[in-house]
Amino acid sequence: MSDPFDPTENAPGPAGLHAAGLHAVESVSDTAPLGLEVSAALVGEYRWIEHALYRLLGQWVTEMPIAAVQVHLDAQSMRHAWHAELFADRLPVMAGADPDVWTAPSAPTTALFAALSGSTPPTTGSAPIAPSGDEDVFEHPGALPRLAALHRVVLPRLVTTYELHLQLASPMTDAPVARALRLVLNDEVEDWQAGERMVERLVSRPHDVAAVYQFLQRLEAVVVGAGATSGLVAIPGPVPGD
């Protein structure tokens, strides 16, 4: 049986229901409500992201040298596990369709988690998503750069995604998803702020600043190069401020 959380089985591509749903996301008009397949593709990717964060942060707990950071990441990891369950419960049930089919990452999500996991981000066609010469940065990210990436790239982009989705959710048809988004957003913002305070305390030397911003710059380049704009997951509708 396939594992919906295995990146090797859910690499982004033009085929499959998830890709069809994301294509529908891109083609929805500014005022149209989210359709069933669009909503399923979004919620399925949220589930994938939250489960991936649960597993990744659980791994990082044993690699962080400071006890306070370990405690923070352990608690945050458990919240991400709960978020994944919330989104799993809100995947639509359609005749003849396995809800796990929707649990798949898009290209920006795949690239982001490859870099955070210490792997060289995947290629798009014949060209790598990562800028040339960045392989060592992604193969050996330090504890502090990873902590900063979580709270200065991942959570801010995830919060933006959830907020944009919430703005477009219909109070009639999307009430269960909107409720889950509000619950998850509350946790994400709290973890983001607590993590940012921690990063600011730990970045205490010029070397720390250089290491953090080198990793953040390359990580943002990877995510943007994979197609991300506002947030991490593509949401239909106009972006405020554009």
Protein language model regions, located:
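Non-heme di-metal
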Residues: 2-241
